[in-house]
Amino acid sequence: MQTILHTQQVEEQERFSYWRDAICDVFVKLDASQLSPHTFTGRMETGSLKDIQISEVNADSQRVVRSNRQIQKSVEDYFLVSLQTKGQAYIKQDQREARLQPGDFTLYDSTRPYVLHFEQPFQQIVFQFPRSLLLAAVRRQNKLPAILNPGTQHPVTTMVSTLLRTVASSYLHLDSITRLRVAETTLDLLATALTTISGVKLNEVNSMANVHRAGARAFISTHLADPDLTPDVVPSAKGFPPAISINYLKRKDNPSLL
């Protein structure tokens, strides 16, 4: 099930107020300000994949702030991963900054203050994970480094960006068993990528191999029903090593092994 929120549902003078309330309801409590004097337009499509909330956001320029005051009053406890798909974004948390171009992604934490700044109209896909879920996946007890933006040239970026786009466009059409599997493999790839980028794993070769394996598993899980899925399709489409793709495709007839 997906919820669609659009500012055209209300009168022009009420649109940004409606939008501010909507993003607080969908994500966490925030302060938001409009950056353009023109009538504001925004649209969100929000759904869930097991414990992961997925939102596609298309909106005009704005500035969003998560303050200490709001954090102290809330019980919200999430990590958010934003994938930029159109326009640019500026994000700041813990004295770290990132400027996102289309294809870039970044991680930030709802339990610490942050600023999101969108100078122009933009599009993003936002994955919202329970904080405890992602920390357990990366085997960290309390925190992850904020604002991880490896840049579009980093090999991890292409795999994570491709996976997030694929999951966001297909999760509503999957059966319940496949949805569970895709949620697990999405978390697996993201956790592996984050530990690789943040330097938690010191062996670069092993770290990238883990990323490739998680990526291949995630891609195959979302395409199990495709009769054209072969060992050649996965590496050519997503840049995974053929040996890894073949290894996981051997398990296609037994999805519980994926």
UniProtKB/Swiss-Prot annotation:
Pfam families: AraC_binding_2. InterPro entries: AraC-bd_2. This is Uncharacterized protein in nit 5'region.
